[in-house]
């Protein structure tokens, strides 16, 4: 078996996770989103999370909710970079931001395997990031 893992990404960081949520940094913007896989305890305190967060997603149902702005100066749309790619980040009512950072290893794999003279049609790319 070959293990693939993500290298450091300057504009994204999973800062902490636990108690059913994850604290993420997208460029200079911090978000809290529910995550049922975060069933363990956080490393950082609740106060540390609150001092960092710009937006928190509050679920209304299992399929929708709303973002609550915790920092009045934060903008609800911004950009981040990965390599030469620039991604537009926007808060959605489905708790997503338009990009799935866990796909980074797939982007690297595709970039390493597909040469410039090849054309790629990604029929399964929810955000389109793998097609960039």
Predicted regions and their residues:
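N-terminal accessory targeting/assembly segments
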Residues: 1-6
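Functionally constrained cores in energy, signaling, and assembly domains
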Residues: 26-29, 107, 125, 132
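Conserved alpha-helix/loop element of class I SAM-dependent methyltransferases that forms part
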Residues: 101-117
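Non-catalytic substrate-recognition/targeting regions of SAM-dependent transferases
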Residues: 8-25, 31-101, 108
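Conserved SAM/SAH cofactor-binding pocket of Class I
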Residues: 112-132
